[in-house]
Amino acid sequence: MNIITLLTEQAQIRPHQPAIIDFPQRKRRVLTFVELEQAATHSAGLFQQSGLQVGDVVLIFQPMSAELYIALAGIFRLGLVAMFIDPGQGLRHIAQCCASQPPKAVLASNIVHRLLALSPTLRRIPLKFAVEELAVQAKSVPKFAPLGRRAWQTHRQTVQHPHYFSAQASDPALLTFTSGSTGHPKAALRSHDFLMSQHQVIAECLALTTGSVSLATMPIVLLSNLAQGITSVIPAGDLRSPGKTDPALLATLIQAENVSSTVASPALLERLADYCQTQQQTLPSLCKIFIGGAPVFPKTLQRLQQVASHAEIVTIYGSTEAEPMAKIAFNQVQMADVQAMLAGGGVLVGVPVPAIRLAILPDRWGKPLLPMSQSEFECLQCSRGVVGEIVVSGAHVLSGYLHGKGDAESKFRVNGSSWHRTGDAGYLDGQGRLWLMGRCSARLQDERGKTYPFAVECALSQLPAVQRSAFLSHNARRVLVVQITDASASLCERLKGVLFPFRKRVQPIIAPTLDLTKLKAWVAWAQVDEIRVFKHIPLDVRHNAKVDYPALYKRLERWDGFFHHLGCFIGGFKHALGLLKH
């Protein structure tokens, strides 16, 4: 079944209900379900008129907006494949992605097209569509488009394509990319059947009321909202950087549009909670808050509950290849669970969703797993409470990557069925709930035993003075890196003696152990050798919430190199002074 049929059904059931409310150029715009359906038939007509055929790939560089979903609906209707690449990864990354599945067309704004002209790979794409904001309700169409590009607004003048491609289960629909352990992009190709299964699982997981209003910050969730008849509000701003969103705008928008639910990154929701608490403001319309995409610590959940006291706050665990995997409501977290998290037990993410099969295998990340029988698989699984690698299988779990690139490191088979290796370490407790311990590749293992970073990050997250932390092995030493909050004046006072005159140019400060003994004692079980304080700990680009450990390693190396050269300079200077005295 073609995923577009669900949108067509909603246009018939609730034609005049708003499907998308967005704010191009800060102006409120409403697109109803029937308007979305009509625009989709026109966009499909434009693609067909341009010569695109079933199976052709359309590369999209377009932020969350009405235009994005009109384009997607037209693409799915015609049986084309939508390709998404993160432009923030650079032109080399884009070229690698396009080489794996060359697109026949690219859709982007005129501004983005000018930047893409720097890429020989993108210049070779035959068809180029230029999107301008306010295209949905534009009363006139520009008489010209930039050289070599076709104005997206002309879809309003093309003949409608009312029929949709009758998709088979395996027909491709959506192509995205994720980085493997080698750094080369892996292509995740989702079929119409996969998108249908994922929508069903997301809908069951969120259990939103048809006709309600949801603040949309994640593209795949908005697509599921449309299929379920839920109004999606897209806030103004760049949602690709959730940690930089305007919290005042979000709070105002939630109240003005009577938003009852949202699915968002911890970085976005933390900023919203900060703002509301500072302004002594609450969000009474919110009934459900779903938070995921990065580790969610108890302190964040507590603050959100204070801001939205009537809301059910739910943590969701998932990944690009399997979304969602597990969930837990904050009101289900007991005091004993919080104490376990503070004592190094990791992050509680709840019971696996019914649609997924989840198991814990011994942590052998980096080594391929050979095909095995069901009995061999069951014998290999870890006992309850034992930390290992999380593996999953299900209809909404990606069974393999395009051309098999990346399958060896992250896929294996049990009785012929595909299983996905998440690369995350965790364990199942006695109640069958999943606890996360961090990335398998980030584990610390030495003569003192094995420790995972999330255990330390979660424990320190409850301290008011610590905004963020990271735990890693560096030069055979267990190093704790902390980022302090702006309000932690007492800690800053203790560190005042080690701040350098040029601290604005050099971010990390090595903190004397004696000054941070309480911090070290808080995680005594981690046996920390050294504590360093950073002005900012590097985070992942996508959610702005997960510690970017490779970037942190590089920063530590640069900092150590700086001190090495500084030491050599001081040593040489002292030696020269000694010679002068003689």
Feature locations, PLM:
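Conserved C-terminal "lid"/linker of ANL adenylate-forming enzymes
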Residues: 517-581
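Gly/Ser/Thr-rich phosphate-binding loop
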Residues: 146-147, 151-152, 230, 261-263, ...
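Conserved AMP-binding/adenylation subdomain of ANL enzymes
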Residues: 81, 195-213, 218-260
